């Protein structure tokens, strides 16, 4: 895909993630035989407005040491849906030759079980410098996203969007046909809500609350 759009792609994998300052991506993926990695795609004019897309790329989610029930694990190859969506959107943007400076970040991992798996009770220092105590290893999506979001924020893009299969609580709240949307941008919220109706792919805005 990158070659079609003449985009540049870099990736950091395995132990290099620790050296480069992405400890939560490494922690979630280190138990797998497939090395965790951060994929970084860039495209467009340096003079164009910056847009950054971040997609959750959990290629399989066993739940880690807080193992999922077998029925819940069956479809967890779909836990990379966020990554698939941002790649599809990036492909559309490049094919349409939109006047934007695009960056795509995908933390790609498998949340597996082994002797090296991260554990409930572990305390991990994230890329932003904040520490997080692991309460449940099956809440891995927010961990890999936090390092990617911290990296994306360093370049201060004009628009930053992340897409993720983040929690079953969204299904409890909204059912199976409506996706949850969170944003602090009122104009963007209105435009996305309107277009979701037009495209018959509905979104429902939920509040962001800092506590």
Predicted regions and their residues:
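A generic structural signal for tightly packed, nonpolar segments enriched in small/aliphatic residues
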Residues: 2-211
């Amino acid at each position: 895909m990158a070659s079609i759009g003449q985009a540049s792609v870099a990736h950091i994998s395995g132990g290099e993630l620790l050296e480069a300052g992405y400890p939560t991506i490494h922690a979630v993926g280190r138990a797998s035989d497939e090395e965790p990695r951060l994929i970084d795609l860039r495209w467009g004019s340096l003079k164009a407005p910056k847009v950054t897309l971040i997609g959750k790329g959990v290629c399989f989610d066993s739940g880690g040491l807080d193992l999922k029930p077998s029925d819940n694990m069956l479809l967890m190859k779909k836990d990379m849906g966020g990554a698939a969506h941002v790649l599809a959107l990036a492909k559309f943007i490049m094919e349409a030759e939109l006047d934007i400076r695009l960056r795509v970040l995908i933390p790609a991992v498998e949340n597996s079980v082994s002797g090296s798996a991260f554990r409930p009770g572990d305390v991990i220092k994230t890329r932003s410098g904040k520490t997080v105590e692991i309460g449940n290893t099956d809440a891995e999506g927010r961990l890999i996203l936090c390092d990617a979001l911290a990296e994306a924020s360093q370049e201060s893009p004009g628009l930053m969007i992340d897409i993720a299969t983040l929690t079953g609580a969204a299904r409890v709240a909204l059912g199976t046909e409506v996706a949850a949307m969170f944003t602090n941008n009122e104009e963007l919220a209105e435009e996305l809500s309107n277009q979701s109706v037009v495209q018959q792919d509905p979104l429902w805005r939920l509040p962001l609350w800092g506590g």
